Amino acid sequence: MNYASFIIKIIKKPKQSFFEKEISLTEISGKLYQIRNKKKIEIPVSLSLWGNLAYDTMQYYHINDYVIVEGYVSLRDKISSGYQIPVDKHIEVSGFKIYPFLLDSIQLTKMDK
């Protein structure tokens, strides 16, 4: 397992579950984009967040938001084949930090003078 940082686009609504009544787990499906030889490659990513970070993620981040994630990376066998480019493995990240990058859900309003 390696510690790394990524910019991930959230593609599905985050799902929250609870363990032992108080421990929160939020799972996010996202895409990691790469550009190779002038081709855009989409890599599926599963992101898991625990505890208070899981609560904050459910509150602040939504579909089509881009986030910067720091965490431990692991490769798993591919579960589904619903992505455009076939990949035999997918990336799972256990997130320790998450930061907003481009939030689609923020509405900027004009202040009245």
Curated annotation (Swiss-Prot):
> Which is an annotated GO molecular function term of this record?
DNA binding
| GO CC terms in record | chloroplast
Q: Where is the signal peptide, in residue numbers?
A: none
User: Where found in the cell?
Assistant: Plastid, Chloroplast
Q: Keywords for this entry?
A: Chloroplast, DNA-binding, Plastid
Fetch the Gene3D superfamilies from UniProt.
Nucleic acid-binding proteins (2.40.50.140)
Q: Where is the SSB domain?
A: 1-101
**Which InterPro entries does this UniProt record tie to the protein?**
NA-bd_OB-fold (IPR012340)
| Name of the protein in question | Putative single-stranded DNA-binding protein ycf41
Give the source species. Answer: Trieres chinensis (Marine centric diatom)
